[in-house]
Regions:
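N-terminal helical cap/lid subdomain that shapes the substrate entry/recognition surface
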Residues: 3-10, 14-100, 108
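Conserved Rossmann-like nucleotide-cofactor binding loop
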Residues: 13, 20, 120-121, 175
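Substrate-recognition/cap helix-loop segment adjacent to the acidic, metal-dependent catalytic center
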Residues: 32, 100-146, 153-162, 203
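A short, structured active-site edge motif that brings together acidic residues
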Residues: 42, 46, 72-75, 134-149
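Conserved Lys-Pro-Asp/Glu-containing loop-to-beta segment of HAD-superfamily phosphomonoesterases
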Residues: 148-181
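Acidic, Mg2+-coordinating phosphoryl-transfer loop and its flanking beta/alpha structural elements
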Residues: 169-212
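Short acidic-hydrophobic, aromatic-tinged amphipathic segments that line or gate anion-handling sites
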Residues: 211-219
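Short amphipathic alpha-helix with an adjacent loop that forms part of the alpha/beta core around
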Residues: 219-225
C-alpha cells in the first residue's frame, strides 16, 4: 500500500471529452430545443457550478429555451447518441490524455482511484479501451453516491477507506474543486489552455483554495514532486 492516494475525476482529466460528452450536449439540445449551444456557453454553465451532470445540464438548457421535455426523455436521447449501437456512439471520439509512461511512474509512488460523475460502467468501458492494465481502486461513479458533486460524498467514501493516508483530488471543474474543499482534500485543478474560459476556470480554482493549477494531467508530477 502506497503512502498516498491520488483520486482523479475522469472527463477533462483522464480523457478529452470535447467530441464526446460536450458534443452530445450540443446535439441533444439541438434535437429538443432547435437551438445550437456553443462550447463556450457550455463552459459558462459548468463554471456556475451545479452542472456536473451532463444529463441535468442538457435538460436545463432545453427547458431554458421553452421546450417542455421530461428529464428521462432527455437522458434516453443523450445516451443513445453517446453509446450509439456500441461502435458508432460519440463515446468513440474520446481521447486518452496521459502520455506514455505517466501512469507507470505515478503507480510506482501512489495508489490511484477515480471519483467521477459518469456511471461507473461507462468509466470502466473507457478505461478498458485506453488503459486496460491500469488499476484504479476504488472507482466511484454517479450511482455510488446519493448526492452528486459538488457534494463530497464520493471523496469522503474514499478517504474513509484510505486509513488516514494523504489524498489529492485532480479535477477540471468548479464542482470538483468544491467537492474537494468540502471533503478537506487538497485539490489540483486542470485548466486547459484549449478551454474557451481558461482564465476564469483557473480563477475559480484559486478561489476554492486549489493546491495547484496545471494545464493538463501530464504536468501532475511537477506538483507532486
Amino acid at each position: 500500500m502506497a503512502e498516498a492516494l491520488i483520486v482523479f475525476d475522469m472527463d477533462g482529466v483522464l480523457v478529452d471529452v470535447t467530441e464526446s460528452y460536450r458534443e452530445t450536449i450540443v446535439r441533444t439540445v439541438e434535437h429538443f430545443a432547435g437551438v445550437t449551444v456553443t462550447r463556450p456557453q457550455i463552459q459558462d454553465y459548468k463554471n456556475q457550478g451545479g452542472f456536473n451532470d451532463d444529463w441535468k445540464l442538457s435538460h436545463h438548457i432545453v427547458a431554458q429555451h421553452g421546450a417542455a421535455v421530461e428529464f428521462q426523455t432527455v437522458v434516453d436521447y443523450f445516451q443513445g447518441l453517446f453509446h450509439g449501437n456500441g461502435t458508432d456512439g460519440l463515446i468513440q471520439r474520446e481521447r486518452w490524455m496521459a502520455r506514455d509512461g505517466l501512469f507507470d511512474r505515478l503507480a510506482a509512488r501512489f495508489d490511484l482511484a477515480i471519483f467521477t460523475g459518469r456511471l461507473r460502467w461507462e468509466a470502466e468501458v473507457t478505461l478498458h479501451r485506453f488503459a486496460p492494465s491500469l488499476r484504479f481502486d476504488p472507482i466511484i461513479g454517479m450511482e455510488d453516491v446519493t448526492a452528486l458533486k459538488p457534494a463530497p460524498e464520493g471523496l469522503l467514501k474514499i478517504a474513509a477507506a484510505a486509513g488516514g493516508r494523504k489524498i489529492w483530488y485532480v479535477g477540471d471543474t468548479v464542482d470538483d474543486a468544491r467537492s474537494a474543499r468540502a471533503a478537506a482534500v487538497p485539490f489540483i485543478g486542470i485548466a486547459s489552455p484549449d478551454s474557451p474560459r481558461r482564465a476564469e476556470v483557473a480563477s475559480l480554482f484559486q478561489a476554492e483554495n486549489a493546491a495547484a493549477v496545471i494545464d493538463d494531467i501530464n504536468q501532475l508530477e511537477s506538483v507532486l514532486a
